[in-house]
A protein has these predicted regions:
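Structural signature of Gram-negative outer-membrane beta-barrels, strongest in the C-terminal barrel
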Residues: 2-144
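Short, intrinsically disordered, charge-balanced linker/junction segments flanking boundaries
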Residues: 1, 171-178
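Surface-exposed, extracytoplasmic segments of Gram-negative outer-membrane nutrient-acquisition systems
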Residues: 145-162
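C-terminal extracellular loops and terminal segments
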Residues: 78, 162-170
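A generic beta-sheet turn/junction motif
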Residues: 130-132, 168, 177
C-alpha cells in the first residue's frame, strides 16, 4: 500500500523591462511524504484492513506487516528567464531553472527507498517566424546538471528506481514550412 501526500505553493512574476524585453521570475516550494506499507497478503490482508489499515495506531503490530517505510522531502526551486524580441517575429531567450522530484520507495516484497532528484537547467534559444510567416523555426541549446537523477531499471519483473549523478547537454530544433 502506498500513500503519498504532496503540498506545494508556486508563483511567477513578469516584468517588462522595455517594449521588447521581458523578465520572468518563478518560485516553487514542495513538501512530500511518501509512505509504503508491505504485508504478506492472504488472510492477513483482511486482518490488516479490519484493524484500520494505514490508520492503525501501531502499524508494526498489524498481523502480516513486513515493512513500513516513510520518505519525507521538501524542496525550494526557482526560475529566472529573460526574453528579447529582436524583431516582431524573432525572439531570443535565456533561462535558468531548478527542479526537484521527491524521494520515494521502490515497490515489491522488499521495498528499498530512493533519494530525491535535484536538477539545474540552463537554456538558450531562438523562436522565429521567417519567410513572411511561411517558416516556423525554434532552436535551443541546454545543459542539465542532475544530482540524484532517477533512472528506472528492471529487476526480475519489477521496476526499480536508482539515483545517479548526470550532466546532459543538448540541442533541439524544430522547423516547419507551411
Amino acid at each position: 500500500h502506498v500513500r503519498i501526500k504532496s503540498q506545494a505553493i508556486y508563483g511567477e512574476a513578469y516584468y517588462d523591462i522595455n517594449d521588447t524585453t521581458k523578465l520572468t521570475l518563478g518560485f516553487r516550494y514542495d513538501d512530500l511524504t511518501n509512505a509504503t506499507t508491505t504485508f504478506n497478503g492472504g488472510l492477513l490482508a483482511s486482518n490488516w484492513i479490519a484493524a484500520g489499515g494505514p490508520l492503525f495506531e501501531n502499524r508494526m503490530d498489524v498481523p502480516g506487516l513486513t515493512s513500513y517505510l516513510v520518505q519525507n522531502d521538501s524542496a525550494t526551486n526557482g526560475m529566472v528567464a529573460i526574453q528579447k524580441y529582436l524583431q516582431d517575429d524573432v525572439m531570443v531567450y535565456a533561462s535558468y531553472t531548478t527542479a526537484s522530484k521527491g524521494a520515494g520507495v521502490n515497490g515489491g516484497t522488499d521495498p528499498v527507498p530512493y533519494d530525491q532528484e535535484d536538477t539545474g537547467v540552463i537554456d538558450f534559444g531562438i523562436k522565429a517566424k521567417l519567410l513572411d510567416g511561411a517558416m516556423l523555426l525554434n532552436m535551443n541549446v541546454f545543459q542539465n546538471d542532475n544530482s540524484g537523477m532517477l533512472l528506472a531499471t528492471i529487476r526480475n519483473t519489477e521496476a526499480f528506481n536508482i539515483n545517479v549523478d548526470a550532466e546532459v547537454t543538448g540541442f533541439e530544433g524544430l522547423m516547419k514550412v507551411f
